[in-house]
């Protein structure tokens, strides 16, 4: 996962100055993970290789379809992942740097890009951890962040930031 975390760190570095690029990067990272999963597991790659179709193959193979999960609370959360993937793909299409904007531009703010990147990171982490569990991989324990480097969310936010 360190390589994936580095890619998301790079995406976060562009959030303020280039939010469109950050959204595109978040979508591209997810798409790469999903396509790698499909290839590594010798699954049939869908004809349309956008984010949604490749995620559909991955989630079915990992047993993440809502009907295959018994706990209703967990079903709700995992269904939320589907919405996140759909939203990130749509945001990339309508506001990302991957497509022209047409007549009407989308006013993408850094906070929107940050939401997309962080949400994509959550999806990526869950998918990779589920994949690891499926194959029986146990990653080495992570080195905890030293207390001097830890920052609470409230310390990062500007008091003027509207929610």
What are these regions (language model features)?
Residues 1-86, 130-145, 159, 163:
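Amphipathic alpha-helical interface elements
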């Amino acid at each position: 996962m360190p390589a994936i975390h580095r890619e998301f760190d790079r995406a976060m570095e562009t959030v303020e100055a280039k939010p469109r690029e950050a959204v595109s990067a978040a979508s591209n990272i997810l798409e790469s993970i999903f396509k790698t999963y499909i290839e590594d597991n010798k699954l049939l790659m869908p004809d349309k290789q956008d984010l949604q179709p490749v995620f559909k193959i991955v989630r079915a193979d990992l047993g993440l379809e809502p009907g295959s999960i018994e706990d209703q609370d967990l079903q709700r959360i995992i269904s939320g992942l589907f919405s996140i993937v759909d939203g990130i793909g749509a945001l990339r299409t309508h506001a990302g740097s991957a497509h022209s904007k047409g007549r009407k531009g989308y006013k993408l703010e850094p906070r929107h890009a940050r939401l997309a990147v962080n949400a994509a990171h959550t999806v990526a982490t869950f998918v990779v951890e589920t994949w690891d569990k499926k194959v029986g991989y146990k990653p080495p324990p992570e080195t905890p962040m030293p207390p001097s480097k830890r920052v609470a969310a409230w310390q990062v936010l500007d008091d003027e930031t509207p929610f």
